[in-house]
């Protein structure tokens, strides 16, 4: 083959990749859920908990500028086959003067002092104990589109449908009167409203609590999305996920540029960007893995970070050529091969969420999402400078499919990690060259996740925007409100959140491998370790070195006892007394966790202070 033929061959390969990417995106936008749904009808869907249908009154509030109420319309509920009561605002009702649309319901109200609570997100509990409260969950971080309440009059779960990434969730208390409702931010869509807006109420019996709320959401999501399957079902076609579930997670970064605020909060160029520094070489990491294996840690899932061009968060979205400092491609391949020889999973970390001006692919900002006025969206500042939002639709149509192919060829296998992918809402783009709504960008995310399944064997990220629930196999942490509450209270501020329950785990513990929160990562304090155990989490460490290796070995010894639970549904979380809980799993296991400084008992079962006890295994 001569040089001309070789060049033509590479060109044709790129064309084919782009055609395949386009076909995949088209299938996603058309509602195709993947080949995994071929046997969707054979799935055993989780049952909906017992419901208790009662009247619900709901209204749509059409809001104008400065939050003026333009008009109110009473909504008629439509009973669904699964027992839910749906209230809908048609997109055609939205006139040009409407800024926001809110759906208010009489059941979603309470008074200060009422028994019960409001519930949202991963399991944030708000007691009815305040005169004034303003809690707004921005749509950018609304991981599950639901809200729930237990009051003396009503117990319900409500699910928002339509324009999934365009609404906030609010819990307000004014003079002791509480109300919870969604608000669709119509003026900030960046396009015409493209879907109707619906809230579906699932009313539960008076004795029901957050357990039934979570099971109702589980049933709803499984029925709504045929691609959602349990880990046990996924393992049938991707057996390496069984090894992932048995493994302690370790991420090791190898190179990067200095990150220091406010110095990093600028747009760098190739001429003035800071130099890339090598933290650790691939050969050094491999030697540390060997020591870990010799210490008795049999199963590890290593996520190799900082391998790409510019190091960790250095020149995103550019991945190639591989950064030379830690050992280049040759060293990276040695790490992949050597890690697998030890029986470990070795996969990589990518960032196809941010883009930096110092990236060779910047091209005047062509790759970035634009606001309607043409300016850039910015989501923070990292080693590469100001982090602008990457237009995933444009990336998928141009370079991303080829990048993923090349990354796989480096030797990564296991569960490829794409940073932030499921931690924030998909980024809208108003660039006339590649406009995309959040719904369209979500479809691209789905296509990318499926490609990761095919190339690497799995897909992982952080948090869990649950539109990708059927595709994501592992998340580094569910989200970080426990850390947020701790940090606020350390500074003398009262957190809006009163406490936490494992709503996410009750709904999806057997669907996505996870770690509860940022406070339950790395080497843990005894109390945070008990939270990790209570929530059924998988240990994770963000480095591997001589200092933390004893902590990793200790976590491994504990995890060996608990890891059979990773594939099991969490069926019930029961608070037996303050600080003493019993967690039940579908395989019959009972896990008692005692957070108190005294022994506790459940009948004949005694649990020592500050410890846990696993029975039925």
PLM segments and residue spans:
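Aromatic-lined carbohydrate-binding/catalytic grooves of carbohydrate-active enzymes
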Residues: 247-401, 413-414, 422-427, 431-433
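Short, low-complexity, charge-dense intrinsically disordered segments
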Residues: 1-14, 18, 23, 27
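Conserved, mostly hydrophobic/aromatic
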Residues: 89, 292, 339, 419, ...
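Carbohydrate-recognition beta-sandwich/jelly-roll modules
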Residues: 41-301, 307, 342-345
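A mature extracytoplasmic/lumenal domain signature
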Residues: 91-93, 306-308, 420-422, 596
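Active-site-proximal substrate-binding groove within the catalytic cores of carbohydrate-active enzymes
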Residues: 162-167, 181-211, 273-275, 359, ...
């Amino acid at each position: 083959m001569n040089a001309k033929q070789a060049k033509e061959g590479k060109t044709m390969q790129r064309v084919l990749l782009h055609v395949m990417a386009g076909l995949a995106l088209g299938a996603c936008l058309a509602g195709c859920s993947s080949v995994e749904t071929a046997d969707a009808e054979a799935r055993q869907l989780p049952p909906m908990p017992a419901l208790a249908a009662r009247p619900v009154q709901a209204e749509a509030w059409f809001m104008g500028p400065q939050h003026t109420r333009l008009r109110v319309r009473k909504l008629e509920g439509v009973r669904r086959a699964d027992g839910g009561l749906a209230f809908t605002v048609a997109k055609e009702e939205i006139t040009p003067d409407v800024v926001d649309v809110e759906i208010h319901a009489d059941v979603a109200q309470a008074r200060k002092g009422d028994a019960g609570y409001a519930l949202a997100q991963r399991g944030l509990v708000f007691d009815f104990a305040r005169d004034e409260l303003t809690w707004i969950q921005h749509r950018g971080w609304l991981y599950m589109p639901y809200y729930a309440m237990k009051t003396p009059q009503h117990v319900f779960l409500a699910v928002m449908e339509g324009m999934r990434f365009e609404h906030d969730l609010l819990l307000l208390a004014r003079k002791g009167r509480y109300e919870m409702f969604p608000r669709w931010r119509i003026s900030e869509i960046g396009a015409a409203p493209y879907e109707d807006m619906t809230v579906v109420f699932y009313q539960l019996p008076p004795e029901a609590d957050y357990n039934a709320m979570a099971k109702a959401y589980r049933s709803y999501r499984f029925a709504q999305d045929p691609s959602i399957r349990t880990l046990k079902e996924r393992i049938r076609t991707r057996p390496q996920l069984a090894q992932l579930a048995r493994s302690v997670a370790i991420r090791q970064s190898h190179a990067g540029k200095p990150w220091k605020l406010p110095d990093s909060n600028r747009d760098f160029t190739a001429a003035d960007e800071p130099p890339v520094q090598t933290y650790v070489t691939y050969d050094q990491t491999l030697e540390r893995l060997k020591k870990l294996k010799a210490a008795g840690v049999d199963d590890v899932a290593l996520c190799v970070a900082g391998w790409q061009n510019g190091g960790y968060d250095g020149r995103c979205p550019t991945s190639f050529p591989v950064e030379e400092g830690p050992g280049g491609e040759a060293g990276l391949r040695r790490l992949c091969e050597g890690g697998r020889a030890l029986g470990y999973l070795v996969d990589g970390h990518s960032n196809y969420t941010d883009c930096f001006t110092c990236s060779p692919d910047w091209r005047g900002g062509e790759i970035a999402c634009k606001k309607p006025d043409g300016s850039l969206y910015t989501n923070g500042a990292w080693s590469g400078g100001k982090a602008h939002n990457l237009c995933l639709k444009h990336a998928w149509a141009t370079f991303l499919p080829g990048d993923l192919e090349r990354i796989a060829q480096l030797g990564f296998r296991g569960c490829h990690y794409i940073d932030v992918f499921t931690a924030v809402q998909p980024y809208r783009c108003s660039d006339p060259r590649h406009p995309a709504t959040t719904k369209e960008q979500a479809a691209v995310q789905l296509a990318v996740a499926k490609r990761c399944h095919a190339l690497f064997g799995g897909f992982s990220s952080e948090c869990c925007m649950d539109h990708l629930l059927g595709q994501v196999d592992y998340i580094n942490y569910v989200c970080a409100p426990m850390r947020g509450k701790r940090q606020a209270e350390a500074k003398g501020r009262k957190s809006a959140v009163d406490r936490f329950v494992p709503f996410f785990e009750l709904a999806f513990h057997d669907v996505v491998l996870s770690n509860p929160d940022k406070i339950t990562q790395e080497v843990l304090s005894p109390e945070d370790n008990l939270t990790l155990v209570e929530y059924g989490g998988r240990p994770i460490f963000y480095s591997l070195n001589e200092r933390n290796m004893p902590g990793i070995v200790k976590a491994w010894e504990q995890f060996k006892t608990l890891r059979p639970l990773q594939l099991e549904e969490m069926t019930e979380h029961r608070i037996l007394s303050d600080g003493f809980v019993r967690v039940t799993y579908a395989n019959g296991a009972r896990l008692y966790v005692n957070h108190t400084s005294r022994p506790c008992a459940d009948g004949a079962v005694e649990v020592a202070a500050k410890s846990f006890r696993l029975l039925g295994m």
